[in-house]
UniProtKB/Swiss-Prot annotation:
Gene: recO
GO cellular component: bacterial nucleoid
Protein name from the UniProt record: DNA repair protein RecO
Similarity comment text for this entry: Belongs to the RecO family.
Matches recorded under PANTHER family: DNA REPAIR PROTEIN RECO
């Protein structure tokens, strides 16, 4: 599998004195790990471009037995500037990247994941204000894009428009919303206000650069966070634990 294309560096690590492994997100192949032999020293082949969050044009080949990938060359396309000096924003980016890695992205969902992750970095690089709950917004949208999409428009039981009812409950295990007419017959779940439902729709339909305009109250943010974390825990099997995402 030999190819040349743009990619986003997610993480790197050293496995010998002069060699690196590089994990990157490709818009056509998803999350891939390749070995950059001489990556710590070769300025001609890599030009110092293998820092996390850099966009790089990569040239990748397979070894003779086709058991692993080799990163032969990398050319820096662009990299963040503000993120390098703003630790708060760096932390938000790191949290989002960890989720991309933990969830795993294959070729089928690669384009959406790449666009979303690039949009996340653009917002963190350019926006004046970053919502505190941004990592949770990102996790929800990535899950939606990778096949776990939910319908925040109609009740899953009767088809009634959720905008037209007074109370709505979200059921994480089923991944559906039901209106108050059913009285929580399924048991469990979380009550969702109209503003939180609007936020779910907005995040599903718009890129990250527009998420700074979501008019949610503190209670609305709490509802979103509880619902998304419970949904991802049940369907994706990931929880945030001691600074990392852990499979359960």
């Amino acid at each position: 599998m030999d190819f040349t294309e743009k990619a986003l560096v997610l993480r790197t690590g050293r496995f010998r004195e002069a060699d690196l492994w590089v994990r990157f997100l490709s818009p056509s192949r998803g999350v891939i790990t390749a070995f950059a032999f001489g990556g710590c020293r070769s300025r001609r082949r890599f030009c110092g471009c293998l820092d996390a969050l850099n966009h790089v044009l990569v040239k990748v080949s397979s070894d003779k037995r086709r058991t692993y990938l080799c990163l032969d060359e990398g050319t820096l396309l662009n990299g963040p500037v503000r993120l390098r000096s703003d630790w708060g924003r760096t932390g938000v980016a790191a949290n989002c990247i960890k989720f991309v890695e933990a969830m795993g992205v294959g070729p089928e969902g690669a384009a959406d994941a790449y666009d979303l992750t690039c949009g996340m970095l653009e917002l963190l690089e350019t926006a004046d204000v970053v919502p505190e709950i941004f990592p949770v917004l990102f996790r929800g949208r990535l899950a939606f894009d990778q096949g776990y999409r939910i319908d925040p428009v109609r009740c899953a039981r009767c088809g009634m428009r959720l905008k037209d009812v007074a109370g709505v409950r979200f059921l994480p295990r089923e991944g559906v919303f039901e209106c108050s007419a059913h009285g929580g017959a399924s048991g469990g779940g979380f009550m969702m206000s109209a503003e939180t439902l609007d936020a779910v729709r907005f995040v599903q339909e718009n890129p990250p650069l527009m998420w700074t305009d979501i008019p949610l109250s503190p209670e609305g943010w709490k509802q979103w966070g509880r619902a998304v974390d419970a949904f991802i825990q049940y369907h994706v099997g990931l929880v945030w634990d001691k600074g990392r995402f852990r499979r359960i």
